[in-house]
């Protein structure tokens, strides 16, 4: 039987992405995704592989091309009973 995932924890964060501007221009958006993944993993005590980035958040990071991701992003984070974490853009 398939077990339905239940939300164990729900939080909102404002993640500062200014460190993405310290890397090469052609790697900034990809690095920003990694920053978000590592930030959420550290705060919710999970592995970075368990963090799933939402489609709207990914689109917002890549909207101004790879060279100019946003400086900050407000996100809503949900941790599920199976240990996975979903990160969505908070509007």
Curated annotation (Swiss-Prot):
Record carries keyword Ribosomal protein: yes
Gene Ontology molecular function, alphabetical: structural constituent of ribosome
Cellular component terms (Gene Ontology): cytosolic large ribosomal subunit
Keywords of the record: Ribonucleoprotein, Ribosomal protein
Taxonomy, superkingdom: Archaea
Database matches in InterPro entries: Ribosomal_eL31, Ribosomal_eL31_CS, Ribosomal_eL31_dom_sf
GO biological process terms, semicolon-separated: cytoplasmic translation
Record family assignment: Belongs to the eukaryotic ribosomal protein eL31 family.
Record's protein name: Large ribosomal subunit protein eL31
Organism: Pyrobaculum aerophilum (strain ATCC 51768 / DSM 7523 / JCM 9630 / CIP 104966 / NBRC 100827 / IM2)
Gene name per UniProt: rpl31e
């Amino acid at each position: 039987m398939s077990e339905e995932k239940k939300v164990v924890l729900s939080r909102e964060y404002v993640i500062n992405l200014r460190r993405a501007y310290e890397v090469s221009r052609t790697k900034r958006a990809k690095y920003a995704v990694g920053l978000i993944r590592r930030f959420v993993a550290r705060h919710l005590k999970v592995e970075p592989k368990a963090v799933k980035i939402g489609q709207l958040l990914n689109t917002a990071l890549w909207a101004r091309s790879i060279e100019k991701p946003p400086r900050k992003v407000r996100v809503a984070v949900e941790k599920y009973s199976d240990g996975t974490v979903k990160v969505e853009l908070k509007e």
